[in-house]
Amino acid sequence: MARYRFTEYFEKEVLRKRAYLKKEWCTRVIDNPLRSEPQEGNRHRFWGQVPELEGRYLRVITLEDKVTIHNAFPDRRFKP
């Protein structure tokens, strides 16, 4: 996980609002995504299934460098 960074927004807001999230899950999704795509605003989206979330899909948003994690949340609408 050393190669990944986290924005201040992720550290102070995302982890506060979604205290159940683990940074390890986010990095695992980026390392082995089911799907990834560019997003507006020079960001990238990654989706992956997380067994610890009862098999739900986690969407992870990074900055354009693809190593700085900015946001993450379970995505109910994602269809693999």
Residue ranges and their predicted role:
Residues 1-80:
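Ribonuclease/tRNase effector modules and their secretory precursors
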